[in-house]
């Protein structure tokens, strides 16, 4: 299987550069199992598309203002993108500079203080910050929001709110779990009234999510690592949902990545079952992999040749995904982080468009 198998052509004007005025006003392409017809809806229609007893699972990670700028002793400019916080004053980072900084070198930060390069960590660097407060708190004032590279503008005040989900609470992501951006408090209230239950996982989306696949043969691709937590309470929620015949719907690919990373085969469950898990994942989901943990997912439209295109193709089938994407392009849907969404049912769900 090749990277080019997941290419499609997208007009630049369909890449959303800013959010809509209302989160739930985004369009929603409902993609039931083939051969049922696609349906053009809105995210605010979700209460009509889900049933009492269904379980929506969100990623509650919170985006940190993870982009910093500074200057090396030589005078060269440096851009720092924090990948992961490591204690109060250390972090794993990406560094953009004309020359790679050496261990022991210092970077004077534009926001004040300095950072010492401790060394390399694979494709990343380890930095120790000399700043007055713990890094997590200092970044709230000193850092800049790391909007994705395809958003061709500087982040504004509005992005501090809109590039964050309304249920974000666990600090640590450098990119938003974008499917969750469509949910506002009125929509959540209507879903509760409908009898839909909510659960949460945490997956801290890392800077690796912006990295392209650099090899054409996918069996040579090395997936980036991300930290996640699937708690015992969520596992019990899923068990109860299954027991009563409800459906499990992931809000975003990060939730699917979390649940599949916590899926374990046991003697009692040879096909596997969800179990509590906290730690790093490097799971790479592409066609040939069977996603067992969810019946459906709400997800945005993904970049050509990305690992997320591969994941949704594994879930719904490559031909079905490409038919949906071609429909979305023809109907002028908005793409990527600030764009529209899909309600995607798995090939094996047999659940139609979810309407009751």
Swiss-Prot record:
On the tree of life, the source organism's domain of life is Bacteria
**Main localization category:** cytoplasm
Give, as in the UniProt entry, the pathway in which the protein acts. tRNA modification; tRNA-queuosine biosynthesis
Entry's EC annotation: 2.4.99.17
What's a single GO BP term from this record? tRNA wobble guanine modification
What's the catalysed reaction? Answer: 7-aminomethyl-7-carbaguanosine(34) in tRNA + S-adenosyl-L-methionine = epoxyqueuosine(34) in tRNA + adenine + L-methionine + 2 H(+)
**Gene3D superfamilies reported for this sequence:** QueA-like
* The protein's enzyme class: transferase
Q: What is an example of a GO molecular function annotated in this UniProt entry?
A: S-adenosylmethionine:tRNA ribosyltransferase-isomerase activity
Q: Which GO terms describe its cellular component?
A: cytoplasm
Q: Which Pfam families does the entry mention?
A: Queuosine_synth
Q: Where does the record place it?
A: Cytoplasm
Q: Which InterPro entries match?
A: QueA (IPR003699), QueA_dom1 (IPR042118), QueA_dom2 (IPR042119), QueA_sf (IPR036100)
Q: Which UniProt keywords apply?
A: Cytoplasm, Queuosine biosynthesis, S-adenosyl-L-methionine, Transferase
Instruction: Summarize subunit and interaction data from the UniProt record for this chain.
Output: Monomer.
Q: Tell me the function of this protein.
A: Transfers and isomerizes the ribose moiety from AdoMet to the 7-aminomethyl group of 7-deazaguanine (preQ1-tRNA) to give epoxyqueuosine (oQ-tRNA).
Please name the NCBIfam families in this protein's record.
PRK00147.1 (NF001140), queA (TIGR00113)
Family, as annotated: Belongs to the QueA family.
**Stated name of the protein:** S-adenosylmethionine:tRNA ribosyltransferase-isomerase
Q: What is the originating organism of this protein?
A: Xanthomonas axonopodis pv. citri (strain 306)
